[in-house]
A protein has these predicted regions:
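Nucleotide/pyrophosphate-binding catalytic subdomain
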Residues: 1-216, 309, 384-386, 401, ...
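Conserved dinucleotide-binding and phosphotransfer motif residues
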Residues: 32, 88, 222, 287, ...
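Glycine-rich beta-alpha junction loops
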Residues: 43, 175-177, 222-226, 230-235, ...
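A conserved regulatory-domain signal marking ACT and ACT-like small-molecule sensing domains
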Residues: 57, 237-410
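Conserved beta-strand segments of alpha/beta enzyme cores
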Residues: 91-93, 225, 290, 370
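Short hydrophobic alpha-helical runs that function as membrane-insertion/retention elements
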Residues: 168-172, 226-228, 292, 373
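Acidic-aromatic/histidine active-site loop/patch
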Residues: 219
Length: 410
């Protein structure tokens, strides 16, 4: 039979009743003859509780000690789930990231997986045992506990699935799959039966929060079939896999992603000379701030306006950096706007269809929505607009590309 790696997030294991429900679900797979490795997150709210304890002690906690602290959340969950499985007659054993030898680099709070020793897991599976692994954590070459960053349990699950050559990695969440857009914004949004790694990666990077970006990258790199399912409602979910032969009537657009957590900054009137972009963005990068979209407008007077977006949480820090940079460059002004949003259309069908961007722009214009910035890739068009128009834009685009009227055939 098949080998499944299943991941259950914090909401799915948020109470002991929900842990019991997960145990029932896992047991049903075992009863059907499948091998199961389960990866779990900390119970909902537990990681935040642990972080608040650290904050009560110091506002500058040591990263190594933070990893030791927050990794305890998953340790509670793996033990409770094993107890629930054993109560149901299932042989089960729990492993921390250290015990299962998920070896990472030493970048505390944001470590990356280097390799996994799966021998112990394989030996357990041969005896019919369910293996329950703590997500989000690992150990470096020196024996220090490390964590993979927020959402790292998804990455743990995919990495284990790749190392074990599992038939499928199943991510159980509080939604029943990947939708054409957020159903809370468009109530006629539809669940997709299938989506490519490439599309899912674009949607995740553009604001869709169903899957963590690193896990999608990992799955695509090692060709691990991913399936997003609900912990609470039975259904087929959404399969994320390599691009294969598509139906003749393949949709141009698979989904609409959006992100409210953006802020825009502009340095006005800097000299249009070689290296100016580096002089602006270098200090931003040195402050460990990620830049998203970039636009440079050159004027006739040999000056340029340089605009880019960052995460809204970094807005004030970036303004401070840019004010210093602007003074050094002789900039006319530094402007900022935290009341923006990004809306993106995503679909591999763009490769073979012309006029997709034009249709997007026409749709927004018809709603009197001004486009402030544009970014494109082979399968994505993203725009920045005023945040107050976000939901109107998403609904209009969802309708224009017939995502809420089409029978799903993917």
């Amino acid at each position: 039979m098949a080998l499944y790696v299943q991941k259950y997030g914090g909401t799915s294991v948020g109470t002991t009743d929900r842990i019991e429900h997960v145990a029932d679900k896992v047991k049903s797979f075992c009863d059907n003859g499948h091998d199961v490795v389960v990866v779990v997150s900390a119970m909902s709210g537990e990681t935040n509780r642990l972080l608040s304890l650290a904050s009560a002690i110091t506002d500058q906690p040591n990263p190594r000690e933070m990893d030791v602290l927050v990794s305890t959340g998953e340790q509670v969950t793996i033990a409770l789930l094993c107890m629930a499985l054993q109560k149901r007659g299932c042989s089960a054993r729990s492993y921390t990231g250290d015990q299962v030898r998920i070896v990472t680099d030493s970048a505390h709070t944001k470590a990356r997986i280097k390799h996994i020793d799966v021998e112990a897991i394989q030996n357990d599976l041969k005896t019919g045992r369910v293996v329950v692994v703590a997500g989000f954590q690992g150990v470096d070459e020196l024996g220090n506990t490390t964590t993979l960053g927020r959402g790292g349990s998804d990455t743990t699950a995919v990495a284990l699935a790749a190392a074990l050559k599992a038939d499928e990695c199943q991510i159980y969440t509080d939604v029943d799959g990947v939708y054409t857009t957020d159903p809370r914004v468009v109530d006629s949004a539809r669940r997709l039966d299938k989506i490519t790694f490439e599309e899912m990666l674009e949607m995740a990077s553009q604001g869709s929060k169903v899957l963590q970006i690193r896990s999608v990258e990992f799955a695509g790199k090692y060709n691990v079939p991913l399936r997003v399912l609900s912990s609470f409602v039975d259904g087929p979910g959404t399969l994320i896999t390599l691009e294969e032969e598509q139906p003749m009537e393949q949709p141009v657009i698979s989904g609409i992603a959006f992100n409210r957590d953006e802020a825009k900054l502009t340095v006005l009137g800097v000299p249009d000379i070689p290296g100016v972009a580096s002089r602006i963005l270098g200090p931003v990068s040195a402050a460990n701030i990620e830049v998203d979209m970039i636009v440079q407008n050159v004027a006739d007077d040999n000056s340029t306006d340089f605009t880019f977006t960052v995460h809204r949480n970094d807005f004030e820090r970036v303004k401070k950096v840019l004010n210093e940079v602007g003074n050094d460059l002789g900039a006319r002004e530094v402007r900022g706007d935290a009341n923006i949003a990004k809306v993106s259309i995503v679909g591999v069908g763009m490769r073979s269809h012309a006029g997709v961007a034009s249709k997007m722009f026409d749709t927004l214009a018809a709603e009197n929505i001004n486009i402030q910035m544009i970014s494109t890739s082979e399968i994505k068009v993203a725009v920045v607009i005023a945040e107050r128009y976000l939901e109107l834009a998403v609904r209009a685009l969802h309708s224009a590309f017939e995502l809420d009227a089409r029978e799903q055939n993917r």
